[in-house]
Amino acid sequence: MSDLLKEFNEQQMKLLSNKEIPKFSSGDTLRVSMKIFDGVSERLQVFEGVCIKRKNNGLHSSFTLRKISYNESIQLQVFLYSPIVESIEVIKFGRVRRAKLYYMLSLFGKSARIKERSDRTKKLS
């Protein structure tokens, strides 16, 4: 039974992997464009935030973004292979020492800043 599930997951990943998924990790600032359906119409909504965690689990791979808007912390969990996700773009590479940044949930303002990784920005330029 587990072999059937593995085969199914691999087939679905091949079908949905035509999108460009950049390499990123926790601490990076990402911009995600998602399709939003408002009744009859369809539009793109952009969410930009810091990646708090990334979970690599095949077809169920996901990551969580956090941003602060009007002094409110907003979190969004995004599945990598979801058909709703239109594009993922890395804005800034952050320098952190942890894989899961749960301590960031209680931080606001200057204390929530993440330093930029200079080694990754030089390679991209």
Swiss-Prot record:
Pfam families: Ribosomal_L19 (PF01245). GO terms for molecular function: structural constituent of ribosome. GO terms for cellular component: cytosolic large ribosomal subunit. GO terms for biological process: translation. Keywords: Ribonucleoprotein, Ribosomal protein. Belongs to the bacterial ribosomal protein bL19 family. This protein is located at the 30S-50S ribosomal subunit interface and may play a role in the structure and function of the aminoacyl-tRNA binding site. PANTHER family: LARGE RIBOSOMAL SUBUNIT PROTEIN BL19M, RIBOSOMAL PROTEIN L19. This is Large ribosomal subunit protein bL19. It comes from Ehrlichia chaffeensis (strain ATCC CRL-10679 / Arkansas).
